[in-house]
Amino acid sequence: MANVTLRNVRKTYPGGVEAIKGIDFAVGDGQFCVLVGPSGCGKSTLLRMVAGLETITKGEIDIGGRVVNDIEPADRDIAMVFQNYALYPHMSVYNNMAYGLRNRGMPKPEIDSRVREAARILEIGALLERKPKQLSGGQRQRVAMGRAIVRQPKVFLFDEPLSNLDAKLRIAMRVEIRKLQRRLNTTSIYVTHDQLEAMTLADILVVMNGGVVEQIGNPLEIYRKPASTFVASFIGAPPMNLIALEPDEIRAQFAGDVRANTEAGILGIRPEDLLISTEAAASGGLALELVVDAIERVGAETFVYGARSRHGEPVISAKPGELPPGEVIVRVPGQSAPAAGERIMVTAPREKLHLFSADGRRRIDL
Protein backbone atom coordinates (compact mmCIF):
# COMPACT_ATOMS: atom_id res chain seq x y z
CA MET A 1 0.00 0.00 0.00
CA ALA A 2 1.12 3.58 -0.64
CA ASN A 3 0.11 7.20 -0.98
CA VAL A 4 -0.01 8.63 -4.50
CA THR A 5 0.68 12.35 -4.89
CA LEU A 6 0.55 14.45 -8.07
CA ARG A 7 2.27 17.86 -8.02
CA ASN A 8 1.62 20.31 -10.86
CA VAL A 9 1.48 17.46 -13.37
CA ARG A 10 1.34 18.56 -17.01
CA LYS A 11 1.29 16.79 -20.37
CA THR A 12 1.93 18.61 -23.65
CA TYR A 13 1.97 16.79 -26.96
CA PRO A 14 3.93 17.83 -30.07
CA GLY A 15 2.35 20.88 -31.63
CA GLY A 16 1.67 22.45 -28.24
CA VAL A 17 -1.53 20.54 -27.44
CA GLU A 18 -1.79 20.59 -23.63
CA ALA A 19 -3.79 17.56 -22.47
CA ILE A 20 -3.09 17.88 -18.72
CA LYS A 21 -2.87 21.45 -17.41
CA GLY A 22 -1.27 21.40 -13.99
CA ILE A 23 -2.97 18.88 -11.71
CA ASP A 24 -2.42 18.54 -7.96
CA PHE A 25 -4.06 16.00 -5.69
CA ALA A 26 -3.19 13.19 -3.30
CA VAL A 27 -4.66 9.72 -2.76
CA GLY A 28 -4.20 8.41 0.77
CA ASP A 29 -2.96 4.96 1.70
CA GLY A 30 -5.76 2.46 1.01
CA GLN A 31 -8.13 5.03 -0.54
CA PHE A 32 -10.21 4.39 -3.65
CA CYS A 33 -9.88 7.43 -5.95
CA VAL A 34 -12.05 7.77 -9.06
CA LEU A 35 -11.20 10.08 -11.97
CA VAL A 36 -14.43 10.96 -13.78
CA GLY A 37 -15.25 13.23 -16.69
CA PRO A 38 -16.44 13.30 -20.29
CA SER A 39 -14.48 11.85 -23.20
CA GLY A 40 -11.37 13.89 -23.91
CA CYS A 41 -11.09 15.41 -20.43
CA GLY A 42 -7.65 13.83 -19.81
CA LYS A 43 -8.56 11.21 -17.21
CA SER A 44 -7.09 8.20 -19.06
CA THR A 45 -4.00 10.20 -20.03
CA LEU A 46 -3.47 11.06 -16.37
CA LEU A 47 -3.85 7.41 -15.32
CA ARG A 48 -1.33 6.35 -17.99
CA MET A 49 1.09 8.94 -16.63
CA VAL A 50 0.80 7.40 -13.17
CA ALA A 51 1.39 3.97 -14.73
CA GLY A 52 4.41 5.18 -16.70
CA LEU A 53 2.81 4.55 -20.09
CA GLU A 54 2.83 8.29 -20.88
CA THR A 55 5.75 10.62 -20.24
CA ILE A 56 5.36 13.62 -17.93
CA THR A 57 6.08 17.03 -19.44
CA LYS A 58 6.26 18.81 -16.11
CA GLY A 59 5.60 18.15 -12.43
CA GLU A 60 6.04 15.11 -10.20
CA ILE A 61 4.23 11.86 -9.50
CA ASP A 62 5.09 10.33 -6.14
CA ILE A 63 4.17 6.74 -5.23
CA GLY A 64 4.94 5.64 -1.69
CA GLY A 65 7.36 8.50 -1.09
CA ARG A 66 9.32 7.90 -4.31
CA VAL A 67 9.17 10.19 -7.35
CA VAL A 68 8.55 7.85 -10.29
CA ASN A 69 8.79 10.25 -13.27
CA ASP A 70 11.82 8.44 -14.72
CA ILE A 71 11.09 4.95 -13.38
CA GLU A 72 9.97 2.23 -15.82
CA PRO A 73 6.36 0.99 -15.50
CA ALA A 74 7.48 -2.49 -14.41
CA ASP A 75 9.43 -0.97 -11.51
CA ARG A 76 6.69 1.28 -10.13
CA ASP A 77 5.03 -1.49 -8.09
CA ILE A 78 1.63 -0.90 -9.69
CA ALA A 79 -0.84 -3.25 -11.40
CA MET A 80 -3.27 -2.16 -14.11
CA VAL A 81 -6.64 -3.55 -15.18
CA PHE A 82 -7.69 -2.60 -18.71
CA GLN A 83 -11.02 -2.15 -20.45
CA ASN A 84 -10.31 -4.94 -22.96
CA TYR A 85 -9.08 -7.46 -20.32
CA ALA A 86 -5.74 -7.96 -22.21
CA LEU A 87 -5.75 -11.74 -21.71
CA TYR A 88 -3.61 -14.16 -23.74
CA PRO A 89 -6.15 -16.22 -25.73
CA HIS A 90 -3.94 -19.32 -26.02
CA MET A 91 -3.26 -19.56 -22.27
CA SER A 92 -5.44 -21.01 -19.53
CA VAL A 93 -6.80 -18.79 -16.78
CA TYR A 94 -4.12 -20.13 -14.44
CA ASN A 95 -1.30 -19.32 -16.87
CA ASN A 96 -2.71 -15.87 -17.63
CA MET A 97 -2.61 -15.06 -13.92
CA ALA A 98 0.82 -16.64 -13.41
CA TYR A 99 2.53 -15.20 -16.50
CA GLY A 100 3.82 -11.97 -14.99
CA LEU A 101 5.11 -13.71 -11.87
CA ARG A 102 7.03 -16.25 -13.96
CA ASN A 103 8.65 -13.45 -15.94
CA ARG A 104 9.89 -11.99 -12.68
CA GLY A 105 11.50 -15.30 -11.73
CA MET A 106 9.28 -16.03 -8.75
CA PRO A 107 9.54 -19.61 -7.35
CA LYS A 108 6.81 -21.98 -8.56
CA PRO A 109 5.36 -22.70 -5.09
CA GLU A 110 4.91 -18.96 -4.45
CA ILE A 111 3.31 -18.47 -7.87
CA ASP A 112 0.89 -21.32 -7.26
CA SER A 113 0.00 -20.00 -3.81
CA ARG A 114 -0.71 -16.49 -5.11
CA VAL A 115 -2.74 -17.64 -8.12
CA ARG A 116 -4.93 -19.98 -6.09
CA GLU A 117 -5.48 -17.40 -3.34
CA ALA A 118 -6.52 -14.78 -5.91
CA ALA A 119 -8.81 -17.33 -7.59
CA ARG A 120 -10.40 -18.08 -4.22
CA ILE A 121 -10.98 -14.39 -3.48
CA LEU A 122 -12.52 -13.83 -6.93
CA GLU A 123 -14.46 -17.11 -6.88
CA ILE A 124 -12.93 -18.36 -10.15
CA GLY A 125 -11.17 -21.46 -8.80
CA ALA A 126 -13.27 -23.72 -11.04
CA LEU A 127 -12.17 -21.77 -14.13
CA LEU A 128 -8.40 -22.07 -13.81
CA GLU A 129 -7.99 -24.60 -16.65
CA ARG A 130 -10.31 -22.82 -19.10
CA LYS A 131 -9.24 -20.57 -21.98
CA PRO A 132 -10.52 -16.97 -22.23
CA LYS A 133 -12.85 -17.84 -25.13
CA GLN A 134 -14.72 -20.20 -22.78
CA LEU A 135 -15.49 -17.40 -20.31
CA SER A 136 -18.22 -14.78 -20.06
CA GLY A 137 -17.38 -11.08 -20.03
CA GLY A 138 -17.68 -10.91 -16.26
CA GLN A 139 -15.45 -13.96 -15.80
CA ARG A 140 -12.80 -12.47 -18.09
CA GLN A 141 -12.84 -9.28 -16.06
CA ARG A 142 -12.34 -11.30 -12.87
CA VAL A 143 -9.33 -13.01 -14.46
CA ALA A 144 -7.91 -9.61 -15.42
CA MET A 145 -8.34 -8.46 -11.81
CA GLY A 146 -6.80 -11.71 -10.59
CA ARG A 147 -3.71 -11.08 -12.71
CA ALA A 148 -3.36 -7.71 -10.96
CA ILE A 149 -3.99 -9.13 -7.49
CA VAL A 150 -1.28 -11.81 -7.70
CA ARG A 151 1.35 -9.11 -8.11
CA GLN A 152 0.43 -7.72 -4.65
CA PRO A 153 1.19 -4.17 -5.83
CA LYS A 154 1.24 -0.95 -3.85
CA VAL A 155 -1.33 0.60 -6.19
CA PHE A 156 -4.12 -0.72 -8.43
CA LEU A 157 -4.96 1.25 -11.59
CA PHE A 158 -8.27 0.63 -13.39
CA ASP A 159 -8.84 2.04 -16.90
CA GLU A 160 -12.63 1.88 -17.53
CA PRO A 161 -12.70 -1.86 -16.71
CA LEU A 162 -16.49 -2.23 -16.96
CA SER A 163 -17.13 -0.41 -20.24
CA ASN A 164 -17.50 -3.59 -22.30
CA LEU A 165 -20.05 -5.23 -19.98
CA ASP A 166 -23.85 -5.04 -20.20
CA ALA A 167 -25.77 -2.94 -17.68
CA LYS A 168 -26.69 -5.77 -15.30
CA LEU A 169 -23.16 -7.17 -15.23
CA ARG A 170 -21.66 -3.71 -14.75
CA ILE A 171 -23.68 -3.28 -11.56
CA ALA A 172 -22.62 -6.69 -10.24
CA MET A 173 -18.94 -6.12 -11.08
CA ARG A 174 -19.04 -2.62 -9.61
CA VAL A 175 -20.09 -4.09 -6.28
CA GLU A 176 -17.43 -6.82 -6.56
CA ILE A 177 -14.65 -4.32 -7.25
CA ARG A 178 -15.60 -2.21 -4.22
CA LYS A 179 -15.79 -5.24 -1.94
CA LEU A 180 -12.44 -6.48 -3.25
CA GLN A 181 -10.73 -3.14 -2.73
CA ARG A 182 -12.00 -2.91 0.84
CA ARG A 183 -10.83 -6.44 1.52
CA LEU A 184 -7.33 -5.90 0.11
CA ASN A 185 -7.13 -2.27 1.35
CA THR A 186 -4.88 -1.38 -1.59
CA THR A 187 -4.63 2.20 -2.84
CA SER A 188 -6.60 2.37 -6.09
CA ILE A 189 -7.12 4.88 -8.92
CA TYR A 190 -10.05 4.18 -11.21
CA VAL A 191 -11.03 5.92 -14.45
CA THR A 192 -14.61 6.09 -15.74
CA HIS A 193 -16.92 8.39 -17.72
CA ASP A 194 -19.93 6.95 -15.84
CA GLN A 195 -20.84 9.33 -13.01
CA LEU A 196 -23.01 6.71 -11.26
CA GLU A 197 -20.07 4.29 -11.25
CA ALA A 198 -17.87 7.07 -9.90
CA MET A 199 -20.30 8.05 -7.13
CA THR A 200 -20.77 4.50 -5.86
CA LEU A 201 -17.10 3.44 -5.92
CA ALA A 202 -15.13 6.46 -4.76
CA ASP A 203 -13.73 7.44 -1.40
CA ILE A 204 -12.33 10.49 -3.16
CA LEU A 205 -13.80 11.78 -6.41
CA VAL A 206 -11.81 13.85 -8.92
CA VAL A 207 -14.03 15.54 -11.52
CA MET A 208 -12.05 16.49 -14.65
CA ASN A 209 -12.86 18.72 -17.60
CA GLY A 210 -10.60 19.91 -20.40
CA GLY A 211 -7.38 18.71 -18.76
CA VAL A 212 -8.02 20.38 -15.40
CA VAL A 213 -9.60 19.32 -12.12
CA GLU A 214 -12.98 20.98 -11.61
CA GLN A 215 -13.53 19.62 -8.09
CA ILE A 216 -12.09 17.08 -5.65
CA GLY A 217 -13.86 15.63 -2.63
CA ASN A 218 -16.21 13.11 -1.12
CA PRO A 219 -18.83 12.06 -3.72
CA LEU A 220 -21.80 13.20 -1.64
CA GLU A 221 -20.14 16.53 -0.83
CA ILE A 222 -19.61 17.14 -4.55
CA TYR A 223 -23.22 16.17 -5.29
CA ARG A 224 -24.54 18.48 -2.59
CA LYS A 225 -22.19 21.41 -3.25
CA PRO A 226 -20.93 21.38 -6.85
CA ALA A 227 -18.21 23.97 -7.43
CA SER A 228 -19.34 24.92 -10.95
CA THR A 229 -22.20 24.42 -13.37
CA PHE A 230 -20.10 21.82 -15.18
CA VAL A 231 -19.89 19.68 -12.03
CA ALA A 232 -23.56 20.33 -11.25
CA SER A 233 -24.66 19.10 -14.67
CA PHE A 234 -22.20 16.19 -14.92
CA ILE A 235 -22.64 14.66 -11.46
CA GLY A 236 -26.20 13.43 -11.00
CA ALA A 237 -28.70 11.70 -13.28
CA PRO A 238 -30.86 13.44 -14.32
CA PRO A 239 -28.54 16.47 -14.14
CA MET A 240 -29.15 19.50 -12.01
CA ASN A 241 -31.57 22.01 -13.51
CA LEU A 242 -29.63 25.16 -14.42
CA ILE A 243 -31.65 28.30 -15.05
CA ALA A 244 -30.18 31.55 -16.36
CA LEU A 245 -31.75 34.33 -14.31
CA GLU A 246 -32.65 37.76 -15.57
CA PRO A 247 -31.61 40.67 -13.31
CA ASP A 248 -35.20 41.28 -12.20
CA GLU A 249 -35.58 37.59 -11.30
CA ILE A 250 -32.41 37.72 -9.17
CA ARG A 251 -33.66 40.84 -7.36
CA ALA A 252 -37.04 39.26 -6.71
CA GLN A 253 -35.64 35.90 -5.58
CA PHE A 254 -32.73 37.18 -3.47
CA ALA A 255 -33.85 40.61 -2.32
CA GLY A 256 -31.34 42.17 0.05
CA ASP A 257 -28.57 39.67 -0.65
CA VAL A 258 -25.66 41.70 -2.03
CA ARG A 259 -23.61 38.77 -3.39
CA ALA A 260 -26.57 37.26 -5.21
CA ASN A 261 -27.49 40.58 -6.78
CA THR A 262 -23.95 41.44 -7.90
CA GLU A 263 -22.42 38.06 -8.79
CA ALA A 264 -25.12 35.47 -9.48
CA GLY A 265 -26.40 34.62 -12.91
CA ILE A 266 -27.40 30.96 -12.81
CA LEU A 267 -29.73 29.17 -10.41
CA GLY A 268 -29.39 25.43 -9.85
CA ILE A 269 -31.88 22.97 -8.37
CA ARG A 270 -31.74 19.17 -8.25
CA PRO A 271 -34.77 17.42 -9.84
CA GLU A 272 -35.58 15.62 -6.56
CA ASP A 273 -35.67 18.93 -4.65
CA LEU A 274 -38.57 20.30 -6.72
CA LEU A 275 -42.08 19.57 -5.45
CA ILE A 276 -45.27 19.79 -7.47
CA SER A 277 -47.46 22.05 -5.36
CA THR A 278 -50.65 24.09 -5.36
CA GLU A 279 -49.31 26.38 -2.65
CA ALA A 280 -46.86 29.26 -2.82
CA ALA A 281 -43.22 28.64 -1.97
CA ALA A 282 -42.06 29.23 1.58
CA SER A 283 -40.34 32.53 2.33
CA GLY A 284 -37.15 32.77 0.27
CA GLY A 285 -38.01 29.63 -1.65
CA LEU A 286 -38.36 29.09 -5.37
CA ALA A 287 -41.59 28.84 -7.35
CA LEU A 288 -41.70 28.03 -11.06
CA GLU A 289 -44.61 27.64 -13.43
CA LEU A 290 -44.05 24.83 -15.94
CA VAL A 291 -45.87 23.51 -18.96
CA VAL A 292 -45.45 19.71 -18.95
CA ASP A 293 -43.72 18.48 -22.13
CA ALA A 294 -43.16 14.80 -21.40
CA ILE A 295 -43.40 12.12 -18.72
CA GLU A 296 -40.98 9.24 -18.11
CA ARG A 297 -42.19 6.49 -15.77
CA VAL A 298 -39.27 4.28 -14.77
CA GLY A 299 -40.95 2.23 -12.03
CA ALA A 300 -40.19 3.49 -8.54
CA GLU A 301 -40.06 7.10 -9.72
CA THR A 302 -41.24 9.37 -12.51
CA PHE A 303 -39.47 12.17 -14.36
CA VAL A 304 -41.59 15.16 -15.38
CA TYR A 305 -40.14 17.37 -18.12
CA GLY A 306 -41.54 20.88 -18.30
CA ALA A 307 -40.83 24.17 -20.06
CA ARG A 308 -40.54 27.25 -17.86
CA SER A 309 -43.41 29.67 -18.18
CA ARG A 310 -43.31 33.35 -17.29
CA HIS A 311 -46.46 35.46 -17.50
CA GLY A 312 -48.01 32.58 -19.44
CA GLU A 313 -45.23 32.45 -22.05
CA PRO A 314 -42.36 29.91 -22.34
CA VAL A 315 -38.97 31.11 -21.09
CA ILE A 316 -35.91 30.23 -23.17
CA SER A 317 -32.86 29.89 -20.92
CA ALA A 318 -29.59 31.33 -22.25
CA LYS A 319 -27.44 29.03 -20.10
CA PRO A 320 -29.29 25.73 -19.85
CA GLY A 321 -26.42 23.39 -18.90
CA GLU A 322 -27.05 20.02 -20.48
CA LEU A 323 -30.82 20.45 -20.68
CA PRO A 324 -32.69 21.69 -23.74
CA PRO A 325 -33.33 25.46 -23.56
CA GLY A 326 -35.81 26.38 -20.85
CA GLU A 327 -36.47 22.78 -19.79
CA VAL A 328 -36.78 21.72 -16.16
CA ILE A 329 -36.86 18.15 -14.83
CA VAL A 330 -38.84 17.22 -11.72
CA ARG A 331 -38.23 13.85 -10.06
CA VAL A 332 -41.29 12.52 -8.24
CA PRO A 333 -41.73 9.23 -6.37
CA GLY A 334 -44.10 6.58 -7.67
CA GLN A 335 -45.95 6.58 -10.98
CA SER A 336 -48.51 9.37 -10.62
CA ALA A 337 -47.77 12.49 -12.64
CA PRO A 338 -49.51 15.37 -14.41
CA ALA A 339 -50.47 14.97 -18.06
CA ALA A 340 -48.52 16.38 -20.98
CA GLY A 341 -49.66 19.92 -21.75
CA GLU A 342 -50.79 20.59 -18.18
CA ARG A 343 -49.59 23.71 -16.35
CA ILE A 344 -48.10 22.99 -12.94
CA MET A 345 -46.40 24.91 -10.15
CA VAL A 346 -43.19 23.52 -8.64
CA THR A 347 -41.52 24.83 -5.51
CA ALA A 348 -38.28 24.32 -3.61
CA PRO A 349 -37.08 25.63 -0.23
CA ARG A 350 -34.28 28.19 -0.18
CA GLU A 351 -31.78 25.77 1.39
CA LYS A 352 -32.04 23.50 -1.67
CA LEU A 353 -31.12 26.25 -4.13
CA HIS A 354 -27.65 26.54 -5.69
CA LEU A 355 -26.24 29.77 -7.09
CA PHE A 356 -23.44 30.14 -9.62
CA SER A 357 -21.66 33.05 -11.25
CA ALA A 358 -22.93 34.17 -14.65
CA ASP A 359 -20.07 32.32 -16.41
CA GLY A 360 -20.84 29.12 -14.45
CA ARG A 361 -17.31 28.74 -13.12
CA ARG A 362 -17.93 29.61 -9.47
CA ARG A 363 -20.35 28.52 -6.79
CA ILE A 364 -21.81 31.33 -4.69
CA ASP A 365 -22.61 30.34 -1.11
CA LEU A 366 -25.10 32.66 0.54
Swiss-Prot record:
Record key words, sorted: ATP-binding, Cell inner membrane, Cell membrane, Membrane, Nucleotide-binding, Sugar transport, Translocase, Transport
Record-level GO cellular component terms: ATP-binding cassette (ABC) transporter complex, substrate-binding subunit-containing
Protein topology in the membrane: Peripheral membrane protein
SUPFAM superfamilies, per the entry: MOP-like, P-loop containing nucleoside triphosphate hydrolases
Subcellular localization(s) per the UniProt record: Cell inner membrane
EC numbers for this chain: 7.6.2.10
Biological process, per Gene Ontology: carbohydrate transport; glycerophosphodiester transmembrane transport
Domain of life according to the entry: Bacteria
Binding site for ATP: 37-44
GO molecular function: ABC-type glycerol-3-phosphate transporter activity; ATP binding; ATP hydrolysis activity
Residues spanning the signal sequence: none
Chemical reaction(s) catalysed: sn-glycerol 3-phosphate(out) + ATP + H2O = sn-glycerol 3-phosphate(in) + ADP + phosphate + H(+)
Family note: Belongs to the ABC transporter superfamily. sn-glycerol-3-phosphate importer (TC 3.A.1.1.3) family.
Summary of subunit composition and partner proteins: The complex is composed of two ATP-binding proteins (UgpC), two transmembrane proteins (UgpA and UgpE) and a solute-binding protein (UgpB).
Role, per record: Part of the ABC transporter complex UgpBAEC involved in sn-glycerol-3-phosphate (G3P) import. Responsible for energy coupling to the transport system.
Name of the molecule in the record: sn-glycerol-3-phosphate import ATP-binding protein UgpC
Taxonomic classification: Bacteria, Pseudomonadati, Pseudomonadota, Alphaproteobacteria, Hyphomicrobiales
